[in-house]
Amino acid sequence: MIEFDLLRTGAARPAAGADDLRRDLELDKIVAAASGGDELVAEVWREVLLLADASPDSISYRQDAVRDALRNRDAVLRLYKIANETVDAVQRRVFLFRPHDPVLVVHEAVNGLEVMVASLRDVLAVLKSAAFSSEAFRQMSKSVLDNINDEFLASAQQLVKILRFENGVQFSVKIGELNILENPVLLVPRKGGNNILSKMLRRDEYVYRLDPRDEAGAYILDDIRKWVLAKAASTVFKAFNHLNSFFEYLRRQLAFYVGAINLSGYFEKLGLPAAYPRLSKGALKFSNMYCLSLSISTGSRPVPYDLDVEVEGGFAVVVTGANRGGKTTFLKAVGQSLVLARAGLFVPADEFTLPSTGEVYTHFPRQEDKTLSYGKFEEEVKRFSAIVEGLRRGDYVLMDESFSSTNQVEASVVAEEVVAALVDSGVYVFYVTFLQDFLNRFLDRYREKAVLLVPEVRQDGTRTFRLVRGKPTPGYAIDIWKKYMAT
């Protein structure tokens, strides 16, 4: 039996905030770049990127497989093409519109088997020539090659030819009581059994020819044919389903790696760095990390980000500063890299180290819904409460101006209580905010577990859109006033 698992996602559930992640982190842009218009690749990528659970072992397993796929990209793309074309060909050639008719089931299943047996030969050829080294792809190759060889394929092709019944259905039966036919057994036609010499040497045999106008007789023969093929139909249909499931499973598993190959090509085209994330407890470090969705939108390399934090337990990265300084873009870049890292993929950075494989949550601004019976601040609190219900130690929460829909004093108090509780619970927080009171109190209280990033401004006032470590300054007072006080 062929068994393999290229993804090792198990029965992992989708992330609780999957829709928010797609929207806030612009993941659909990344998926579109990886899929290249292939809907199956897009579907599998959304599924893997938005997994709630990701263990260090599963991440390492997929990372090794991604590296292997990139080294053997021709083999992976060829296998995916074979699986895709096979599934499509079977869908075009097989029409089981009467599943209870044994004759039709055998005929249609054989149509599909003929296609798939030929494709198996192509799969074997690719696997024999490939040089896979990862556990995932070596396991797949071994399972296929251990169960399928040239002898098996030759036998399968011969069986398909026999099941065509080009010379009619040959079978034997026992004559039971009252001359009732019993125990039909399909017979394998003898080789050369229909040539002239064999007919000349054949002993006398009883032959009954049905009159062309005998409709009742034709119905009886049709019923006999169905009766004889009933058991065979079940076996043939199981074989068809088994092979069809193999090709569907193969192309779905490979789709993830086809997307990785496509995205790698995109990185090369734009000159983006590609790093495979490392896991190091208590450390968050990245250098020259780019916002991938922005790069996709602009077709260029945007301003990169750097950070190096060494702490035990939860911590907070707080970002503040003037509008249009790259703060939200930074938040998206972090979130995208975390999601890619958990999927076992490379990220757009020279280096990327994360402290845990926890789940990622986002709390970004939403347009006010006029149909709600409560205000915008209540909506923010309600949405954040839903996030808190699923949080665990080691998870990540990305907050973009959360709780800013109320006044500065109330917003600062709520923000301080929330962020402090998250950090104390071992959660990693990234928070973009203008709340000056919160910044002063929280950073003083959590100076060992928090870092403040501000947009870099040169001496001549030019903004570089890079973020550097800093401290709250009154220089952003006008921006804050415009944000919260202007009406």
Language-model features: locations:
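Assembly/interface hotspot detector across virion components, adhesins/toxins, and nucleic-acid enzymes
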Residues: 1, 22, 257, 453-457
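Conserved amphipathic alpha-helical "coupling/scaffold" segments
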Residues: 1-172
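An acidic intrinsically disordered interaction segment
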Residues: 75-86, 217-227, 444-447
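Regular secondary-structure segments
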Residues: 91, 233, 385-389
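Conserved P-loop NTPase architecture
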Residues: 95-289, 293
